[in-house]
From Swiss-Prot:
Entries under PROSITE patterns matching the protein: RIBOSOMAL_L20
One GO term of the biological process aspect: ribosomal large subunit assembly
Keywords on record: Chloroplast, Plastid, Ribonucleoprotein, Ribosomal protein, RNA-binding, rRNA-binding
A GO MF term: rRNA binding
Pfam families named among the record's database cross-references: Ribosomal_L20
Cystine residue pairs: none
GO-annotated cellular components: chloroplast; ribonucleoprotein complex; ribosome
Subcellular location: Plastid, Chloroplast
Gene that specifies this protein: rpl20
Family: Belongs to the bacterial ribosomal protein bL20 family.
Job of this protein: Binds directly to 23S ribosomal RNA and is necessary for the in vitro assembly process of the 50S ribosomal subunit. It is not involved in the protein synthesizing functions of that subunit.
Protein name, as recorded: Large ribosomal subunit protein bL20c
Length: 115
């Protein structure tokens, strides 16, 4: 087989990896092999946590709606069930914002759906 001299391509590749890991501690920012492993791990963690953030935000909305409901003596699943029966199309994000910013409107919505 013929010899392939990678030249500047290999240097550019290594330089980009080390540039990405420049803020990491110790050998993870100095040595190419460990830096490459840490870059892959960092990107995997980033993707995982982007998905987990969606889960956590939805959990926060539900907690806020539930807290506002319990101030009025209602439970969360009751209000969600009533909204689906009455065909009220408000998602949890909007409902949580209404509950926090304008509680009078929230209780108006609760009365409207018959809770």
């Amino acid at each position: 087989m013929t010899r392939v001299k990678r030249g500047y391509v290999a240097r550019k590749h290594r330089k980009n990896i080390l540039k990405f890991t420049s803020g990491f501690q110790g050998a993870h920012s100095k040595l190419f092999r460990t830096a490459n492993q840490q870059k892959m791990k960092a990107l995997a963690y980033a993707q995982r946590d982007r998905n987990n953030r969606k889960r956590d935000i939805r959990r926060l909305w539900i907690t806020r709606i539930n807290a506002a409901c319990r101030n009025n003596g209602i439970v969360y699943n009751g209000i969600i069930h009533s909204m689906s029966e009455k065909k009220v199309h408000l998602n949890r994000k909007i409902l949580a914002q209404i509950a926090i910013l304008d509680s009078n409107s929230f209780f108006g919505i609760v009365k409207e759906i018959g809770m």
